Amino acid sequence: MQIFGKILGAFFGFLFGGVFGALFGLFIGHQFDKARRLSQAGFKTAGFGQGPSQAQRQEEFFKSAFAVMGHVAKAKGQVTKEEIQLASAMMDRMSLHGEQRRAAQDAFREGKERDFPLEQLLERVKIATSGRFDLLQFFLELQISAAFADGDVHPSERNVLHKIARGLGFSSEQLERRLQMQEAAFRFQRQGGFGGQQHQSHHSSSHGGWQQASQTDRLADAYKILGIDANADGKEVKRAYRKLMNEHHPDKLMAKGLPPEMMNMAKEKSQEIQSAYDLIKKEKGFK
């Protein structure tokens, strides 16, 4: 944590202006520390005390997402065909073409480098998102999706995901919960559970895939997608649903700095939550 500017500002402020001078000096010192931190992270600012622009934040989030995705894919030593297909499919879902697609591909390749600076990049992501929980959560969920590309999460990938989660400010328990939710979501997706549509799976059928599940299994996965127990009552179900929809609302994420290219993926996530909720609601018989 950089506090040199705060200490120096408070000291000289108190020296020349007493308590009020110290407070003013503390504020000036804080702005100095902030500018220094941004500069060290590689961001250009418009002026003293100002952070990166919205466009800079979105570009950083976009490139970092694909770079870290490449790092996750490389975790077990070799990037599989399924992982490359998943990255390509994500680019398709974002409607990336031309320069944008090349930027995403370059970032993905960068993430596969042996000396990839993961911790530094995660620090840049935190700065780019201003530490907003829902944006950081969306970033983490993208990486979890990448880890599930070939149907299962390898121990090496899990270790990298724990590093990513810690770097973004999430606990191991929070990561494990999201891993369970994502695994359930993939099973639900294969059954055409999102709005009744059968989405193309990125998992290879040669790996066995997920077997066609019974209605009971689909319902169990719906509960896991919402992060609740099967014995949850109507109030608990609604509370979990509203919380997740609030955190993943595409328009809210866009307003907070989500790159516009990722809007479709945010919509898919909210549709996933909605479909799981609708199934539970139908089963429990409440409106």
Swiss-Prot record:
Q: Which PROSITE patterns match?
A: DNAJ_2
A cellular component term, taken from the record's GO annotations: plasma membrane
Q: What GO MF terms are annotated?
A: protein-folding chaperone binding
Query: Keywords in UniProt for this one?
Result: Cell inner membrane, Cell membrane, Chaperone, Membrane, Transmembrane, Transmembrane helix
Name the Gene3D superfamilies on file. DnaJ domain, TerB-like
Q: What is its main location?
A: membrane
Q: Does the keyword DNA damage apply?
A: no
Superkingdom, natural source: Bacteria
- How is this protein situated with respect to the membrane? Single-pass type III membrane protein
Boundaries of each J domain copy?
221-287
Q: Where in the cell is it found?
A: Cell inner membrane
Task: Please give the residue ranges for the topological domain Periplasmic.
Answer: 1-6
Q: Specify whether Ribosomal protein is a keyword of the entry.
A: no
Residue ranges of the region described as Disordered: 192-213
- List all topological domains (Cytoplasmic): 31-287
Q: Where are the transmembrane segments?
A: 7-30
Listed HAMAP family: DjlA (MF_01153)
Q: What does this protein do?
A: Regulatory DnaK co-chaperone. Direct interaction between DnaK and DjlA is needed for the induction of the wcaABCDE operon, involved in the synthesis of a colanic acid polysaccharide capsule, possibly through activation of the RcsB/RcsC phosphotransfer signaling pathway. The colanic acid capsule may help the bacterium survive conditions outside the host.
UniProt-listed NCBIfam families: PRK09430.1
> Per the entry's comment, what about the domains?
The transmembrane domain is a dimerization domain.
How does this protein assemble?
Answer: Homodimer.
Q: What is the protein's given name? A: Co-chaperone protein DjlA
Origin species, per record, is Vibrio vulnificus (strain YJ016)
Q: What does the record give as the organism's lineage?
A: Bacteria, Pseudomonadati, Pseudomonadota, Gammaproteobacteria, Vibrionales
Q: Which gene specifies this protein's sequence?
A: djlA
